[in-house]
Curated annotation (Swiss-Prot):
UniProt signal peptide: 1-18
Gene Ontology annotations of biological process type: polysaccharide catabolic process
Keywords, ordered alphabetically: Carbohydrate metabolism, Disulfide bond, Glycoprotein, Glycosidase, Hydrolase, Polysaccharide degradation, Secreted, Signal
Official protein name in the record: Probable beta-galactosidase A
SUPFAM superfamilies: (Trans)glycosidases, Beta-galactosidase LacA, domain 3, Galactose-binding domain-like, Glycosyl hydrolase domain
Family to which this protein belongs: Belongs to the glycosyl hydrolase 35 family.
Keyword Glycoprotein appears in the UniProt entry: yes
Binding site for substrate: Y96, N140, A141, E142, N199, Y260, Y364
UniProt subcellular location: Secreted
Residues that carry a glycan: N156, N373, N402, N422, N622, N760, N777, N914
Organism lineage string: Eukaryota, Fungi, Dikarya, Ascomycota, Pezizomycotina
Amino acid sequence: MKLLSVCAIALLAAQAAGASIKHMLNGFTLMEHSDPAKRELLQKYVTWDEKSLFVNGERIMIFSGEVHPFRLPVPSLWLDVFQKIKALGFNCVSFYVDWALLEGKPGEYRAEGNFALEPFFDVAKQAGIYLLARPGPYINAEASGGGFPGWLQRVNGTLRTSDPAYLKATDNYIAHVAATIAKGQITNGGPVILYQPENEYSGACCDATFPDGDYMQYVIDQARNAGIVVPLINNDAWTGGHNAPGTGKGEVDIYGHDSYPLGFDCGHPSVWPKGNLPTTFRTDHLKQSPTTPYSLIEFQAGSFDPWGGPGFAACAALVNHEFERVFYKNDLSFGAAILNLYMTFGGTNWGNLGHPGGYTSYDYGSPLTESRNVTREKYSELKLIGNFVKASPSYLLATPGNLTTSGYADTADLTVTPLLGNGTGSYFVVRHTDYTSQASTPYKLSLPTSAGRLTVPQLGGTLTLNGRDSKIHVVDYNVAGTNIIYSTAEVFTWKNFGDSKVLILYGGPGEHHELAVSFKSDVQVVEGSNSEFKSKKVGDVAVVAWDVSPSRRIVQIGDLKIFLLDRNSVYNYWVPQLDKDDSSTGYSSEKTTASSIIVKAGYLVRTAYTKGSGLYLTADFNATTPVEVIGAPSNVRNLYINGEKTQFKTDKNGIWSTEVKYSAPKIKLPSMKDLDWKYLDTLQEVQSTYDDSAWPAADLDTTPNTLRPLTTPKSLYSSDYGFHTGYLIYRGHFVADGSETTFDVRTQGGSAFGSSVWLNESFLGSWTGLNANADYNSTYKLPQVEQGKNYVLTILIDTMGLNENWVVGTDEMKNPRGILSYKLSGRDASAITWKLTGNLGGEDYQDKIRGPLNEGGLYAERQGFHQPQPPSQKWKSASPLDGLSKPGIGFYTAQFDLDIPSGWDVPLYFNFGNSTKSAYRVQLYVNGYQYGKFVSNIGPQTSFPVPQGILNYQGTNWVALTLWALESDGAKLDDFELVNTTPVMTALSKIRPSKQPNYRQRKGAY
């Protein structure tokens, strides 16, 4: 069938002229460009109607997970994440690009090594995953500046508006990044099928024009001019209808919105607030964008967590498997055709890339943990939903109806939303009317079916909806030509294996279920017990009823085998596509879905392919695991698991069975406390002999920052001088007149920041930080000063990233870092002359491999001593567990070897002992990558996962710590250790380490 392409905005900016016309196809409206030549460009790739996207002419539900490649700086691990998302039944990944990491200096775009996008596209294609590209320029994303580079603080214009200075500042970045994305589009054989200009462009204040069609059109034109031809989609922060098709200038092709309905209160993970379940999304969609598929571009899959928060384990408990059952099935009840879950894999805010509202971990409570584990129950639950949608193409043809408490269920305690098919199958989404309910509610259903309206169960008993659960009951569900008249048990998947069909159904504990199949054959139980089971033949319909049990039953009706499972059992089932070879996995399509097999195998099944007479599975195991293959192709005779030929048995139902033995290797990790630690004082700036003549002078009379006027004689805003990340150090020189007794200083570093102040070598005090304080005014008493003598104030500030810029017009990202104001008693402010430093070179940053944000302004960082093989041979031997006896900062470095056996995925963590003693701050560097900021008095993070590829699992590693003692009695680490969690026997390919350039003497380092 020929499908013609659509462009609400022309395929290229030069093609903007030309009206749209409408066609009808199978009763659905398609939009297409009026110029046939322009239609041809996309006709066989990506089109859409009001029901769904079409990719290569095939209607497809986009089930997507959010992944940020910049939060996992090991490109050879990206395939692992993609395969784990593919195994969920998903077919797409959405990704942000962080501008701040690619254009650290205005006009110099660098997207190489860990920051290159092409390898990300390559492994997406290898895994058979489509991509939704979201390069901003603004991304939010809990990233420093919301993805804006720090030098935008100097732009004389309002951010995210039509202000010419801002637009010009974005041109270089978008021209480059969009051109790279364009090369990865499906039109060029790549995986990119959608492109999102801007991000959550949904609200403004402060007299900013909003919505500004000229601005959005500019961002759109930037993309089109760079070669973007796939459809453009947006993510309104709520159902506001902003920039939807038909709104005029700046409209996108497909309207989408975001939703985080449960909020972010991880401190109360069991609390579901009243009224937070969306109920109007369908009617909102019909008002705002009825000609496009209903699209949820960010739907909640976890939560951020602030400094001092309860931790991401609590966030995973808040947005858990029960949340998924209730909220994601609710999304499906609205007819969601593009559903992207934020985040599906969170990763790490390594190298200072996060904003002040979060700490190093960006685990997010996601289905995949920060260390890429799939052990959370929410991953398994999501796999049930994802594979159901993948196996149910008629879902996209069903029309969502209005939710109701009558007409379907026999109790008003339950709400049912119908999705009615026109001879193509119907779906009934059942939930508690009070969605927060934890009650178990019995019910019966009245269902309209091809056999008439039926009251279910027909064979007696009642159905049960347990608390915080939801069901999708199918009606007239097509299983390869066999009509399932209804099933109250939920569908995991089904397959047609030629000589037989398989349907897998499941239910929760304590539930009773029933299904009816349009088939003349008798019902046979071919595996499992007949107890708590009954069946009845009614004409040409077989009705089966059973109580859910942990023991598997297989029922055969004609050529259909129906597996009756409990939910915990089906968690162990996987549906890998059957590929032609081991080089790549095909994109999800009718063909690849039909060719899939079913494998029961525990922890993870990655891929399946045939070669000659062999069936090859790649899978991971974390325990001795029984393995079953259901639907092995008739032309294969041998089974290979992770390349090893494996003996198996075949039972009477044609199921292959074997067992994979698991014997964890002994992982011997070095004791961190026993390493040969070398120590260097890295706050040499407070020594009386220190010379700061090479430092940049803070001598600007004015600031280009348009947000906050100066309240100091010279600008002390760090970004005015090109310093946007990590620790800042200021040195203020003055000649005393003897009247100076106190020093007031207001510093700003973002939430949970800290600062310390010295006068010459005398420690004055510290602000140890609170999450609630982005800035703080401190007053310090000075020791007696001598008239006519030179003094130096040294101020150390830990910056926590730049603010995001979510509300247009606030220019919140321009909130400066550094010193906002100060007062030296008895003196004019101009009596002090200032110098400052951050990372060496500022925007001319030294380490092009690890990027512009990785290192800050400490002496050891400026010298590059945090990198492997520093010149530490003559340094003092001292351990961070002995620590410092007075305020200051110590730098510690050591090397160690690892010998982790290949073939095992072994997550490693650096753990700090949690102290209630004096406040201190630690930066953790691993092979030159900053992989942790530990704040002892705020927390919550004490455990820092570091992936293979940053750590060398077979070879030498360097670890470095900066220990900042903020109080007068100094500080030491209570404990510091390297630990592992359960080794996973893995089919992962060999992990190539990210580049780890060693220390080299830096020209001009001070």
